[in-house]
Amino acid sequence: MSLFAAIGYMVREVFVFVSYVKNNAFPQPLSSDDERKYLELMEQGDAQARNLLIEHNLRLVAHIVKKFENTGEDAEDLISIGTIGLIKAIESYSAGKGTKLATYAARCIENEILMHLRVLKKTKKDVSLHDPIGQDKEGNEISLIDILKSESEDVIDMIQLSMELEKIKEYIDILDEREKEVIVKRFGLGLDKEKTQREIAKALGISRSYVSRIEKRALMKMFHEFVRAEKEKKAKE
C-alpha cells in the first residue's frame, strides 16, 4: 500500500467513528473484565479488539466536545479531532501505569482538541471540513468532507492530487526519529522495497503491534500537518 493510500484509509476510518458520535449511536461501556480482555488482545495485534475499545469509548468524545461549545468552532470538526484523540489514546494506553483507560482517553481527547484550537488561533483561520483543500481530476474543488464521505477508491486520488510526492519530505520532517524510521521503512521511501511491520519489528527489536501503533500515530501527524498547511496556504491567497 502506498503512503497516500494509508493516509486515505486512516481518514475514512476516522469518519466511520465520527458518524457514531454524530448520531449518538454509542455502544454500552465495557465491563472491567471485557476491557482488560480486549486490551490484551489488541496488544497481540487483534484489530477487532482495538476497534471495539474505540467504539465503546466514543461517548467520551461527545462528552468532552460539549465543554468546547462556547468556542464557536464547528462541532463536526471538534468531533473529528476528538475522535483522533481517542484513537491515539487507545493505541498508546498502558494498563501498567495505573491510570484507568477512560481517564487517560478523556485527557488525550481534550489535549487533541486544545492543540487544534491553538493551531487555529495561531493561523487565525478556521479549519473547516467544508473548506476547499484541492481539486479533483476534472478541476472541481474538493473539501475534506468530500474525502471523508467518498465511497470509492477516488479518496486516494483526491489526497494524492494535493499531497504530491515532492511534498512528502516536509511532512516526514515533523515526525520524531522513531516514527520517521518506521514510515521510511514501511513505505520504501528512498529504499528498494517496502518492509512489512513484522520485518520492521525484528529490525528495531520491538513488537509488531508497537510498530503498528507508531505507524498509525505517524500517519495521523502527517495528515494533520497536510490539512494545516493547506488551510494556511488558503488563508494567504
Curated annotation (Swiss-Prot):
UniProt KW Coiled coil keyword: no
DNA-binding region(s), residue ranges: 197-206
Molecular function per GO: DNA binding; sigma factor activity
UniProt short sequence motif Polymerase core binding, positions renumbered to this chain: 77-90
UniProt GO BP: DNA-templated transcription initiation; sporulation resulting in formation of a cellular spore
UniProt keyword list: DNA-binding, Sigma factor, Sporulation, Transcription, Transcription regulation
Domain of life the protein comes from: Bacteria
Matching InterPro entries: Cro/C1-type_HTH, RNA_pol_sigma-70_dom, RNA_pol_sigma-K, RNA_pol_sigma70, RNA_pol_sigma70_r2, RNA_pol_sigma70_r4, RNA_pol_sigma_r2, RNA_pol_sigma_r3/r4-like
PROSITE patterns tied to this protein: SIGMA70_1 (PS00715), SIGMA70_2 (PS00716)
One Pfam short name: Sigma70_r2
Propeptide residues, chain positions: 1-19
The record's account of how the chain is modified after translation: Proteolytically cleaved in the N-terminus probably by a SpoIIGA homolog to yield the active peptide.
Entry annotated with the keyword Nucleotide-binding: no
Disulfide bond positions: none
Family stated for the protein in its record: Belongs to the sigma-70 factor family.
Function of the molecule: Sigma factors are initiation factors that promote the attachment of RNA polymerase to specific initiation sites and are then released. This sigma factor directs the transcription of crystal protein genes, a sporulation-regulated event.
Protein name (database record): RNA polymerase sigma-28 factor
Gene giving rise to this polypeptide: sigK
